[in-house]
Amino acid sequence: MSKRFEIKPSLKLQCLGFMIGSMFFAVGSFGPISAAIGSDASNVLFFIGSWGFTGAAFIQLQLSGPTRNERGALRAVWLAASTQFVGTILFNVSTGSAIYAHSINAKQDLVWAPDAEGSVLFLLSGAFALLALARVGRLWKPRDRDWVSNWVNMAGCVAFGISAVAAVVTSNGGVENASLAAWTTCIGAVCFFAASAVVLPEADDSTASAEI
């Protein structure tokens, strides 16, 4: 009888997923590369990268543990994972739509709107992750890998939020500030890559504390 192949969710896989997704976003939004390959190719890279994010976020949600702690309160770790997972799905919609959306309405409703909503959810996710640190007294632990990871991740969320604001679709079908949108997307992607890379050396199969 053949042995069943099974991939077990782990922090290492989560980190690798976010790092792979971040690489695609960083390459697609990096000015010289984006100019060389064109917007269509960049959009394809974003779409591929968004699925790296979604896969990693799904693993994170699985590892986050129960929704509530023993006192019945919603756990910050679960809130961070769940909001991020939904945000990545919205990025799937946005980046996928960007490949074929040509009308102004399509760009506004199918590309920018889910991008903005996903960015808001990423900001909430980053805030919940910091709340989880605060609940265990680690909100200021600069030498701690988790502290570094969470704050760098929050910086990435802020960068993605700025990108969404800069990418508002104008009346002629362009974006408000294409250069700012691209560079903050690239910065955010680099932050997300670094946030995962910093904890990868110590990644194991453990889940978060059920209390936070």
What does each model-found stretch correspond to?
Residues G87-G96, A155-T170:
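Hydrophobic alpha-helical transmembrane segments in multi-pass integral membrane proteins
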Residues F5-T54, L61:
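The feature marks the first
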Residues L13-I20, A41-G52, A76-V86, K107-L124, ...:
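Physicochemical signature of membrane-embedded alpha-helices that form the seven-helix bundle of GPCRs
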Residues V158-G161, V168, V190-F193, A197-L200:
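Hydrophobic alpha-helical segments
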Residues G28, A56, F91-S94:
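Alpha-helical transmembrane segments and their immediate juxtamembrane boundary regions
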Residues M1-S10, G31-I37, I59-W78, S97-Q108, ...:
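Juxtamembrane membrane-water interface segments of multi-pass membrane proteins
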